[in-house]
């Protein structure tokens, strides 16, 4: 299978602060089916999503592979993630329209290239954008899930302390973007309430960022995260970008 990995240049106007809604679909694919799954998604279903973008039913979409996909074959863990970006909740509520014209877009019965039989949807999460930096080209993403004790304090520090720090470091050491989302649904005692993301141009830069000691101590000394989120990130995941689609007006 030919390599379909692409760099994506994302602009701030792709996601309007405080407005856009993000839906994340997590899939598990057995290791012996990953090549087939990725081929079908890129060759066929990317056309369906592009048509939805062209028709105004979707702003943007990204297709990711989890770093250990195909290496650790745990059926309870995601191997891939689809990110769908909607203008607002109204557009999200009409998301079924994305797939309604699949047959017309493809020109044949879409069930013949379906991926449901070779993958399992483990969960779907919806978020609302709080803030982010203008994004640059990236190849890897780190998603940080948290359930802070003080959500308002957590968000305020991210915007007032960490965002300026990250902005200053855009383009340095492979760093390419940052953002923060609030969980909309599902919600619960065992669910993260917020997600932050970091983007990187290389695997090495992403791995360096995951290192426990790789923090600017001048920033850490000003942080009150030990109060806002005493337990730290509940989970962190490293993903590789396969494809990004979307245009901005």
Predicted regions and their residues:
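Short S/T/G/P-rich N-terminal loop/turn motif that feeds into the first structured element of a domain
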Residues: 18-103, 112-249
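Bacterial Sec-dependent N-terminal signal peptides
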Residues: 1-21
